[in-house]
């Protein structure tokens, strides 16, 4: 094989690895956004029910606490220092 062909193959492999890493990060961030939207919807439902009935819905609160207490998706992504 000629050096140019070897260089082209190495470049394709490096580009593929970079693409996999980038799309993995995008997928993780997308999951975080979806989870946050679900939490926001639950908070809105709890607020609406509290305004309507005068007390908060315990079912929604339990679901919200289960989502919030699930912990960090990535242990290295801790912002509470």
Curated annotation (Swiss-Prot):
Residues 1-7 are extracellular. Keywords: AIDS, Apoptosis, Host membrane, Host-virus interaction, Inhibition of host innate immune response by virus, Inhibition of host tetherin by virus, Ion channel, Ion transport, Membrane, Phosphoprotein, Transmembrane, Transmembrane helix, Transport, Viral immunoevasion. The chain crosses the membrane at residues 8-28. Phosphorylated by host CK2. This phosphorylation is necessary for interaction with human BTRC and degradation of CD4. Ion channel activity is inhibited by hexamethylene amiloride in vitro. Residues 50-81 are annotated as: Disordered. One of its GO terms (biological process) is symbiont-mediated suppression of host innate immune response. Residues 29-81 are cytoplasmic. One of its GO terms (molecular function) is lipid binding. Gene3D superfamilies: HIV-1 VPU cytoplasmic domain. The modification Phosphoserine is found at residues 53, 57. GO terms for cellular component: host cell membrane; plasma membrane. Residues 53-63 have a biased composition (Acidic residues). Pfam families: Vpu. InterPro entries: Vpu, Vpu_cyt_dom_sf. SUPFAM superfamilies: HIV-1 VPU cytoplasmic domain. It is found in: Host membrane. The N-terminus and transmembrane domains are required for self-oligomerization and proper virion budding, whereas the cytoplasmic domain is required for CD4 degradation. The cytoplasmic domain is composed of 2 amphipathic alpha helix that form a U-shape. Homopentamer. Interacts with host CD4 and BRTC; these interactions induce proteasomal degradation of CD4. Interacts with host BST2; this interaction leads to the degradation of host BST2. Interacts with host FBXW11. Interacts with host AP1M1; this interaction plays a role in the mistrafficking and subsequent degradation of host BST2. Interacts with host RANBP2; this interaction allows Vpu to down-regulate host BLM sumoylation. Enhances virion budding by targeting host CD4 and Tetherin/BST2 to proteasome degradation. Degradation of CD4 prevents any unwanted premature interactions between viral Env and its host receptor CD4 in the endoplasmic reticulum. Degradation of antiretroviral protein Tetherin/BST2 is important for virion budding, as BST2 tethers new viral particles to the host cell membrane. Mechanistically, Vpu bridges either CD4 or BST2 to BTRC, a substrate recognition subunit of the Skp1/Cullin/F-box protein E3 ubiquitin ligase, induces their ubiquitination and subsequent proteasomal degradation. HIV-1 lineages are divided in three main groups, M (for Major), O (for Outlier), and N (for New, or Non-M, Non-O). The vast majority of strains found worldwide belong to the group M. Group O seems to be endemic to and largely confined to Cameroon and neighboring countries in West Central Africa, where these viruses represent a small minority of HIV-1 strains. The group N is represented by a limited number of isolates from Cameroonian persons. The group M is further subdivided in 9 clades or subtypes (A to D, F to H, J and K). Belongs to the HIV-1 VPU protein family. This is Protein Vpu.
């Amino acid at each position: 094989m000629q050096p140019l062909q070897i260089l082209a193959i190495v470049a394709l492999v490096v580009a593929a690895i970079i693409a996999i890493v980038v799309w993995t990060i995008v997928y993780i961030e997308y999951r975080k956004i979806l989870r946050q939207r679900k939490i926001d919807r639950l908070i809105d439902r709890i607020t609406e029910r509290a305004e309507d009935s005068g007390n908060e819905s315990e079912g929604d609160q339990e679901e919200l606490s289960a989502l919030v207490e699930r912990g960090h998706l990535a242990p290295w992504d801790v912002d509470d220092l």
